[in-house]
């Protein structure tokens, strides 16, 4: 990267240290806990207008107040808006309420490894519906405002978990196969990367870049709230993956913030990053602590998922 050397221990604050985004508008989903809070904090420190898109308005307002108290007086502004990604009506209302250019959309919210098969009222498996379909509906719904920004960036927070499973197009919602919390999570994270690949190709002429990332192994995030001690202890045995070294929340938010604001990735699109650099392609998952699978970079898979997703959110 030109001018900077970033890595696994880089923090979000280091990424934005010399970045100024006055009069830029930002949306961060899931910004009431974990990495989402730190992402919002870092982006707000640049002077941007940051909207915290959250399920729990009270929690979101508390976070916004805490961030505002930490920042020096300046042009930055924090807003809080309700968004439940598993509820199509909530997503549609958020989209309807938005007006004007959107410069950065950080699709950060998610659920992880739900222990039991749960479906939305429409019959969609909950991890796929929340992690992918909700963000897909949000992003496509806001597309005209992203295009209006003349150089917008969309950031899709994925995971090493995409190595657990590709998108199983013939049974997205576990109607014909036994439910597994890890393959379900993996499928949704694979979809997050394929969204970036598909969006990059479709939105290039609008000046919109779309990239995906692995934030890292952040033990203090609320993402793993559904997991018990045994689930975490058996992680490697059940998934054939080795956990990467633990990061702080500040380090975990860094790659997302890099893709959102860094001049070093200007024009980069359709890529998958980890530890603030583009991830290497890996063909086998066993023993890996990182890397990206070929099936999530495949344009045909991305196109197929895009078409299916459009049909599912109608």
Q: Which residues are covered by each model-predicted region?
A:
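Rossmann-fold NAD(P)H-dependent dehydrogenase/reductase core
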Residues: 2-231, 311-312
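C-terminal helical subdomain
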Residues: 2-6, 188, 235-290, 297-303
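Pocket-edge positions in alpha/beta enzyme catalytic cores
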Residues: 52, 83, 244, 294-297
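Alpha-helical packing segments of well-folded alpha/beta enzyme cores
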Residues: 63, 195, 252-255, 305, ...
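Charged/polar, low-hydrophobicity segments characteristic of intrinsically disordered regions
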Residues: 69, 76, 287-295
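Amphipathic terminal alpha-helices
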Residues: 298-314
């Amino acid at each position: 990267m030109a001018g900077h050397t970033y890595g696994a221990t880089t923090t979000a604050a280091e990424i934005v240290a010399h970045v100024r985004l006055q009069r830029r508008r930002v949306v961060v989903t899931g910004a009431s806990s974990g990495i989402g809070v730190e992402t919002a904090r870092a982006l707000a420190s640049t002077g941007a207008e940051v909207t915290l898109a959250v399920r729990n308005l009270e929690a979101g307002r508390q976070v916004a107040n805490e961030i505002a108290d930490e920042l020096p007086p300046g042009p930055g502004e924090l807003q809080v808006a309700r968004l439940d990604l598993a509820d199509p009506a909530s997503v549609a209302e958020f989209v309807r309420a938005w007006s004007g250019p959107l410069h950065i959309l950080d699709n950060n919210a998610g659920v992880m490894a739900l222990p039991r098969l749960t479906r939305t009222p429409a019959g969609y498996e909950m991890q796929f519906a929340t992690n992918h379909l909700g963000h897909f509906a949000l992003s496509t719904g806001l597309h005209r405002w992203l295009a209006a920004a003349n150089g917008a960036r969309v950031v899709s927070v994925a995971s090493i978990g995409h190595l657990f499973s590709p998108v199983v197009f013939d049974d997205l919602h576990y109607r014909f196969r036994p439910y597994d919390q890890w393959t379900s999570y993996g499928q949704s994270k694979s979809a997050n990367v394929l969204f970036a690949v598909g969006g990059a190709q479709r939105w290039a002429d609008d000046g919109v870049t779309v990239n995906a990332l692995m934030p890292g192994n952040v033990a203090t995030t609320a993402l793993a709230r559904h997991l018990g001690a045994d689930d975490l202890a058996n992680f490697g045995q059940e998934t054939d993956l080795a956990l990467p070294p633990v990061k702080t929340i500040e380090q975990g938010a860094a790659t997302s913030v890099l893709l959102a604001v860094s001049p070093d990735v200007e024009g980069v699109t359709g890529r998958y990053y980890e530890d603030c650099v583009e991830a290497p392609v890996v063909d086998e998952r066993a023993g890996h602590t990182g890397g990206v699978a070929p099936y999530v970079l495949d344009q045909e898979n991305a196109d197929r998922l895009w078409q299916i997703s459009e049909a599912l959110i109608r």
